[in-house]
Design a protein with these regions (language model features):
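Extended, charge-rich alpha-helical interface modules
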Residues: 2-75
């Protein structure tokens, strides 16, 4: 059964959040020289925020797949 538009939108949002978090972590890890005004505390704060976003996105994708993977909608 095809997923509803709301479930598809939730999946797309979680995928976008995951990509954004991975990009931020990659920039902080590999291209930090280009980010001028950051202190060590700023880098850690930004990395922690990106990790939180990544964890949240992965959790959402796992939950959406668990309940709306290849199965019919539960309601």
């Amino acid at each position: 059964m095809k997923k509803s538009k709301i479930i598809e939108a939730l999946i797309r949002q979680a995928e976008a959040d995951k990509s954004k978090a991975l990009m931020a972590l990659d920039l902080l890890e590999n291209q930090a020289v280009g980010i001028g005004d950051h202190t060590a505390n700023d880098f850690f704060k930004d990395a922690n925020e990106a990790l939180d976003l990544l964890t949240d996105a992965d959790d959402k994708l796992e939950t959406l797949n668990k309940y709306w993977g290849d199965q019919p909608l539960p309601f």
